[in-house]
Structure formats: C-alpha cells, structure tokens
Amino acid sequence: MRASEYLIPTLREIPAEAEVVSHRLLLKAGFIRKAASGVYTLLPLAHRVLRKIMRIIREEMDRQGGQEILLPIMQPAELWLRSGRWHVYGPELFRLKDRHGRDFCLGPTHEEIITELVMGDVRSHKQLPLLLYQIQNKYRDERRPRFGLLRGREFIMKDLYSFDRDEAGLEVSYRKMFEAYQRVFSRCGLEFRPVEADSGPIGGSVSHEFMVLAGSGEALVVYCPEDACGYAANVEKAESRAERPKTKEDPLALELLPTPGKRTVEDVCAFLGVGPEQIVKTILYETDRGPCAALVRGDREVNEVKLQNAIGAMHLEMAGPATIERLTGAPVGFTGPVGLEGVRLVVDDEVSFMVNCITGANRGDAHYRNVNPGRDFPLQVVTDLRLVREEDPCPQCGRPLLAARGIEVGQVFKLGTKYSEVMGLTYLDEHGTERPVVMGCYGIGVTRTLAAAVEQNHDEQGIIWPTAIAPFAVVVVPVNVRDEVQSALAEKAYTVLSEAGVEVLLDDRPERPGVKFKDADLVGYPLRVTVGKTAVDGLVELRLRKNGDTRLVGIGELVDTVRGFL
C-alpha cells in the first residue's frame, strides 16, 4: 500500500473536545472522525486495527468451539418485557416504534434474543453444550458520551453465549472463556488484570472484568500484590476485612448533645473533638423496595452497588431534603438510626462492631453520643457496604490492598438460569425430564480494546502500536522521492517485504522528511525503514518505534532483519 493512495488525514492541531490520550491521538493520527456525540467514523487505519483484533478474537473463540452468528440489532420490546429488563435499563436503552406503533430497541446486549433463538431450535441434552458468538454493533444512549471510543453511544462488541445442561457444565464453559480472554488480550499486546466484578443489569451470580491498566481508566481496581494472595476486584465489587475497634470499651448510657448548625462529619468532629471513625453516617435512599438507610463509619463512603444488591432493589437514589425531613422530622445533616421508623436499616459490618459512637438524633441541631448498634437501633441487614480504598486490609489475606485505574475491555458472566427460567428455555435430559438451560455470557469491547491499546502504548510523539494489531507493521520512508537511487531502493524494499508477507506501507508522498518522520511516529508503525544517503551503498536504516533503536542493513538482509525485529 502506498501513502499517496491511502486516506491518512493527520492533523497538526488536536481538537479541543478530546480529553484523553487515545481520543486525541486517534483523531490527530487520522484513525477516526466524529460524526455526532459518541458516534465515530472509523477510517482505513482504524479499520485495519479492528480487523486484526477481530481476527484474534475469532481464532480464540473458534478454538473453544464457538460458532459465529449474527443477531439483529433491532429487537422487539416483547422479549425485553418478558425478561423484565425493558424498564430496568432506563434511558440508556435506545427505543423506537415502527410504522405500526410496535416497540423496538437497539440492542445494548443480546441475552433476550439469543435465548429466544435457542428456544426454537434446541430441545435435547444431546445438543448441549452450545457456544454461539457474534461481533456486532451495540447501542447505548449514554448520558454523557466522552473519551472518544472509550465511552460512545455506538460501539462494536463481541459477545458469546454458552448454553449448558447444569452448573458443572457452566463452570467448564466459564473457565474456557476466561482463559481464552487472557489469550486474546495477551496476543493484542496489552497489560491487563482480571478482577472480580458486579454483574450489573445483565445479572447472574459470578462475573469477572478484564481491565487494561491505564491512568485514564474510569474504573478503579483494588488488588493484593501477586506475591501475596492475588485478590483483585473492581471497586464496585471489592471487599475488605472489617476494621474492629482497637480498644475495648464498655457501652455507656445514651446521651443527647446539642450540635447547633453542625451538619457534616467534619463539623461534628471539630465541635466534639472526635475522629470521623467514631461517627456513624446515616444516608437515606429512596428505592423501588421502599426507603432505606445506609450506615457507614464517618470516614467511609457508601458503595451504592453493594447497597442495591443487599436489598434487591432495581433502582435507588439518595433522598432529597424534603424526603429526609418527612422521614426523620429533621433537616439534612441530623439523620440517625436511633428511633428511625418505617425505614429499612442496612448496616456496614464495621459499624456493627462500633461501641459508644455518635449519630444524628433525627432532630434539628442535635446528635446522640454513646450509641451502640444492636442496643440503640436494630441490626436489620448487616453486610459489607463500604467503598473499599487503597490500603484497606485484603479480605482474603489481610495485606494492604493496592489501587490502580483501569479500562474495562471484557467481562464474563455466569448467568445461570436468570434468562432461561423467565423466558422458558428448557431441554429434555437423558431421562426425559424438562430442565432449564444454564447460561453464560462473555463480552469483549472491540472498539474499546483499540482505544485502550493506545492509552497503554504511546509517548509524546504519538501511538506505539503492539505489532500484532498495528495497522501496518512497517513503513518505508524514502528521504527524497526525487532522488532516483533512493526511490528505486525504497521500491525494492517495499516489494521484498510485501512479497515476504510483511504488512508494509510505502510513504511515497512528496513531503519533507521531517513531516514523514513525524507522521510515522504519530501513527505508530512498529518499524520504520528509512531510505536516505546510504542508498548508494544499498543500505537502509531500521528504527524501532518503541525504543528508538536503529540499525543499518543491506537490502538482501532486510526481510530476515525485519522479521527478527518484529
């Protein structure tokens, strides 16, 4: 391929809306162009990268017995109503009507429609296990699309669904996909970490995310060092060992204290001369299961995902001032669990161990001192409710946890019978008994993987593509295209590399050498072959993008040397 014939519209200025490295570089290097908020056109270079990522994915899915299909993007609302997710998904679901007034959606996931498909064609245990996958456009009406390909409204995903006879079969399928995902991301040249994760609206009992470690990642991952136990989890799912009081105290009599205008933990600590770990925060929420109060220590934050799971709520949001006053009789800042009626109490397990703590008194300008859980308020639901932070003790071994930011590029789920039971997907076992099919779901964000690779592989000059997914492995750059010797040797280098099966681009544009060198670094070809003054001696210069190492080689050694570098 010749650069003079290829669409690589590099930019000299970075668009103002580009916030993260991948967004800036993919725009500047001519990989993508914005069509609308969260919607991008993928230009030829990006399409080449995507094809390579998809080839790796297909090879690994096929190796495990996966069969590729293509499901419809537009899905009838009837299926989503049957599964119960039509209303759960909320405003993120693109909804539309056809000319007859029938409701449809643009699929953000495909659990319902693939369950319906298998229902029609799988009847017997002899047809199981079954692995079906697709690589397909997905749609999600993000409230705030941002970061280019990392959080868009239209994106490409691979999703595979497993169908098994029982939980033992699901465990085999889950392990196969888990290991296949590790190979996919390793082959793509990414540094990643599998972590425990919450299942979210897709549901199921067990889930893991595959996180590409990058400072720009939206997700926070906590993990135990690998020389310890290796525990790792998304912060939404992460647990830690509950901290118990360091000194033993006897419970004291409950005492009401005036705290005029002291609404925040910081205000109360300063006024009473105590630390935040002696205070219990009581935070009210409105949910579809009724009002609830989350209780955490004053130096902790509520993990709302854990809270939602603990009470089995579909929706929850923090109560507003009017609701707080109606439920407690007090303004914001003075809520507490003592005497709080008609509200379900969900207590973090650290709070359950506290003695003689301080809480709001459910009356204006007042707090209680010497509150003791179980004595002064009921321990209705006790669970790990806090948001885990760095240096909390690991739940498995007790070592201090580390934290890093990551980009989720894949997630695997044990769905169990969540969809098969509500939608009626069953099979007949060897005794003729009807049983629900046990399902798993396994997704990879293809466009997100492309962007994550850039986030992890770049420098001040531009992208540094891992060789396996680079748009071209080699760029040949003649310094002076008007020099007949240089042009002839560049053509020869291009020809011998192409004939050897190396993906190579010849930059034959009549540009200054500096422009072509900058573009080569910006686009991120793993290897640059420069044809300059040494062309008269039949020599070319090889330069590795990732470290700048260079070497002069003769044209006869070029193919073997390039293969060695790559």
From Swiss-Prot:
The keyword Cytoplasm applies. InterPro entries: aa-tRNA-synt_IIb, aa-tRNA-synth_II, aa-tRNA-synth_II/BPL/LPL, Anticodon-bd, Anticodon-bd_dom_sf, Pro-tRNA-ligase_IIa, Pro-tRNA-synth_IIa_bac-type, Pro-tRNA-Synthase_IIa_type1. This is Proline--tRNA ligase. PANTHER family: MITOCHONDRIAL RIBOSOME PROTEIN L39/PROLYL-TRNA LIGASE FAMILY MEMBER (PTHR42753), PROLINE--TRNA LIGASE (PTHR42753:SF2). Consists of three domains: the N-terminal catalytic domain, the editing domain and the C-terminal anticodon-binding domain. Homodimer. The gene is proS. Catalyzes the attachment of proline to tRNA(Pro) in a two-step reaction: proline is first activated by ATP to form Pro-AMP and then transferred to the acceptor end of tRNA(Pro). As ProRS can inadvertently accommodate and process non-cognate amino acids such as alanine and cysteine, to avoid such errors it has two additional distinct editing activities against alanine. One activity is designated as 'pretransfer' editing and involves the tRNA(Pro)-independent hydrolysis of activated Ala-AMP. One of its GO terms (molecular function) is ATP binding. Its main location: cytoplasm. GO terms for biological process: prolyl-tRNA aminoacylation. SUPFAM superfamilies: Class II aaRS ABD-related (SSF52954), Class II aaRS and biotin synthetases (SSF55681), YbaK/ProRS associated domain (SSF55826). It comes from the Bacteria. Belongs to the class-II aminoacyl-tRNA synthetase family. ProS type 1 subfamily. It catalyses: tRNA(Pro) + L-proline + ATP = L-prolyl-tRNA(Pro) + AMP + diphosphate. It comes from Desulforudis audaxviator (strain MP104C).
